[in-house]
Amino acid sequence: ALALSSDADQPIEIEADFAELDEQAGRTIYRGRVEVWQGSIHMTGDLLEADFDADQNLIKVKMTGAPAWFKQTPDNSTVDVEGEAKFIHYFKLDERVLLEREAIVTRGEQRFEGDRIDYDTERSVVKARALEPAAATDDKPAGAGRGRVRAIIPPKRNTPE
C-alpha cells in the first residue's frame, strides 16, 4: 500500500495563514503556506479545501499550489512516494490520490509524468493520462509535446550473493 497502515489512525495537523470553517457545508478552507501532516503523510500548497461528513470524518481534500506537493511512506518500504501537481485530490473512502495538471509521481528512481495521475493507495496502482494531443504549429507537428505520458523505470540492480 502507498501509506503506512497506521497513517489513518493518526490525527490530522494543519497549519496555514488563514482558515475558514463552514459547518453547514461540512467544508474547511485553509489559505497561505498550507502544510498538512498525518502520520507519514506530508502535504504543502497554497489552498486546501477539506470536506467532512456530518460526524466530522474527512471525506476528501483538494490541495492547490504552484505546485502542490505530497509525500508518503509506504508499508514495508524505506523509499517515500512523492508527488506534485497544480491540484492534488485525496479521496479518503476510495484510498485514492488524484494529481492534475503538470503531475509528477516519484518513488525512488521511478518517475511518472502526465496531465493527470490517479494513484490507488491501497493497491499501489498508478494510472497516468496526458493532455489531448496538441495541434500542429509552425515549429511542432500535431500531437507533439503535451499529448504524452512519460515514465522512467530504472533497471533492476542485481545484488551480489
Report each predicted region and the residues it spans.
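Mature-chain termini and adjacent capping regions
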Residues: A1-E161
